Amino acid sequence: MHGLLLAAGLLSLPLHVLAHPQPSTTTSLAGRAGTVDLNEFRMAHRSSYTGNDEMMKQPSIASFRQGTYLEVATELVKQTMPNMEFRLVDDHYVGDSGIGHVRFRQTMHGIDIDNSDFNVNIGKDGKVLSHGNSFYTGPAPSSNPMVKRDFMDPMQALHGVRKALKLPIKADGATVQDMSEHKVMFKGTSGALSDPTAKLCYMAKEDGSLALTWRVETDIGDNWLLSYMDAKESAKVHNVVDYVAHATFQVYKWGLADPTEGNREILNNPWNLKTSPLTWLADGQNNFTATRGNNAIAQYNPDGGNDYENNYRPSPKNLKFEYPYSANMDPPKTYIDASVTQLFYTSNVCHDLYYMLGFTEKAGNFQVNNRGQGGKGGDYVILNAQDGSGTNNANFATPPDGQPGRMRAYIWTRANPPRDASFEAGTVIHEYTHGLSNRLCGGPANSRCLNAIESGGMGEGWGDFYATAIRLKPKDTRKTNYVKGGWVNNSPKGVRMYPYSTDMSVNPLVYTSNNKLNEVHAIGTVWCSMLYEVLWNLIDKHGKNDGPVPVFENGVPKDGKYLAMKIVMDAWPCIQPCNPNFVQARDAILDADKNLTKGANKCEIWKGFAKRGLGVGAKYDPKNRTGSNEVPKEYKYSAHME
């Protein structure tokens, strides 16, 4: 048979292949000439599952415990499938429940059998909890195809897939570029969003036989396909997998701060595959039809408890997260499906936008599966809608990287009927930003660096700043004022002392205001007021991108809004001391701009801070802060000049 192909240093499956989002629920390649029904090419179900009860009937395996969870899992596969050839897939991790998840890929003659996996789950006690198996057990090819090389070249496979599926790809004059021993890339094609690739692999067929195939990957936007073309018959496609999950979400779309700013819409596939390549409904191990995935898990939590995995969450089989909601509906539990869906949507968009701005796996972001990109996985955000542990508030708990964050969105009783915090995006964004700032200030492994009164206040201010920047509208100018929490609190004044404004007569807060403040939200209002000044200075200089994502040039956002958000985010890791004060945070923002743009915006930044008393001469003393409207000498500036 075949020797074990498992050793340290073996190449893992490419990252895009590890992405296994929910297969498309649509039946055709819409918009293509002579539409093709993809259901004809779905893979057959071949897997088996051995649960814990069944494992306990196999004492020799159930009690097996030796070494790390990877070693235990490897030994199980050896014992269960003796003499099989396989390799470790590099997407293993330990989840928040303490269960280790390990996956193996079967190989034959050193070539992957692409639909033959063995996944093992190891419990907290180090013993095998359960496993799943789809290994191929039929007859093996008598010879290594790489020796005879009696199969078509990959270019023929690309043309075969293009013709069979009627894909809008042109490959005349394209060339083949080697990527690895069994994988190539096609350069010079048109019609695809990225260069198509082809990988030689086996496919276990429904009839029990094995087929050598070219797995041709083509991203054409509405469909991102893995097409398994027979390597010997150019007109035969065995299977097709579509990475694009066609899910719909009925929500207040990104940019609407609360229900007063617009109507709900039905959005199709709202995720960004560059920042959430597994989509929002998969984690690389599992595909979900409920509000859970790699970045977040959202559910109803009426008792306010800490257990959440078995709580109710909407789970439409057709992936249509479309539920009725009106602010006049009462009681709130009657629209819990809409509430959970909205909270899940807003939090996932936060993940995707913040990822673009720098909150990645290495920086300690919130993901179950980090896909080999660094950081610690196993830490999506737990999203509790209509949490019963409180009212008239929301909060976010941020443990170190590798442990899930937790957001609690409460019912607010200041209106009749009560209002649900899930529908105020400003509240959700504010809370999610706590996770961002706590992970970045002090590093992913230390979530204790925003606990002093002034640093804690800045944590609140950063949350307000991002929520306010995101809600800016196309017609807004520096004369536009915004309140925080107006809708959910049923108050035109919102939940802060003053609106965010560049008009000192509307919002008079300055650095020395902190001398009379001893509450973090109040101090945070001072900090965000300063950042709001900087934001508009940068917008006036660079313009404002009103789209949902930034446009970069050499890693720098081209507009002032996203540039301000990027500089503020970059500043957090630059803050050297734990629990920084306003002066140190201001300097970190200047340093971040110097690193990002070579200091091209220091004038605008200095003017924004100096206008509200955090100029060159500002000094920190916890009981007697000294304010300053001075800027460096090269910038002539009057304190209240815009």
UniProtKB/Swiss-Prot annotation:
Enzyme class: hydrolase
Cofactors that this protein relies on: Zn(2+)
Pfam family, one: Peptidase_M36
EC number(s) from the headed UniProt entry: 3.4.24.-
Signal peptide: 1-19
Positions annotated with a glycan in the UniProt record: 287, 595, 624
Keyword terms of this UniProt record: Glycoprotein, Hydrolase, Metal-binding, Metalloprotease, Protease, Secreted, Signal, Zinc, Zymogen
BP-aspect Gene Ontology terms: proteolysis
Highest rank taxon of the organism: Eukaryota
Propeptide: 20-246
Keyword flag Signal: yes
Subcellular location(s) of the protein: Secreted
Main location: secreted
Binding-site residues for Zn(2+), renumbered to this chain: 430, 434
Gene Ontology cellular-component terms listed: extracellular region
Family matches, as InterPro entries: FTP_domain, Fungal_virulence_M36, Peptidase_M36, Peptidase_M4/M1_CTD_sf
SUPFAM superfamilies: Metalloproteases ('zincins'), catalytic domain
Family: Belongs to the peptidase M36 family.
Function of the molecule: Secreted metalloproteinase that allows assimilation of proteinaceous substrates and probably acts as a virulence factor.
Name the record gives this protein: Extracellular metalloproteinase 5
Organism listed in the record: Arthroderma gypseum (strain ATCC MYA-4604 / CBS 118893)
